[in-house]
Amino acid sequence: MSRRRRVIHKEEKQDSRYGSALVARLIGTIMHSGKRSIAERVTYAAIEESRQSSDAVDPLETLNKAIDNIRPRLETKSRRVGGATYQVPMEVAPERGTALAVRWIVNFAKARKGSFRKALANELKDAAMGQGNAVKKRDDTHKMAQANRAFAHFRF
């Protein structure tokens, strides 16, 4: 991790159906052992299913709303100061917040029973309404940061 200069980020790839970088990131997170076509099929079906159950016209509207509801604003990072380790609250960069939100959605969808497609659709639906396990995880992350704000002066 170089401290010399800012990293120049590559342009994000977009998915073939919606032309969205967020959907491409979701597909990449779901993909296992390089099987992109299976991940795409599951993701597109889940997005369509979550859109049909809500009153949204645009299929990406539900996904974007779900990601915005899950994206954390604060998190805690461990910082060692003189033999003691403190959980120091830090602001989350937008890119990291999106990555965490996508990861949480996929992990909590995997934890649900039934087919992954239905579980992902239900998790997206719940997240768009401000409910579900991923939203609870975001709230827990914020509570942890709030509880440890006394250590905010250790921020680096």
Model-identified regions with their sequence ranges:
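Strongly charged
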Residues: 1-33, 37, 44-156
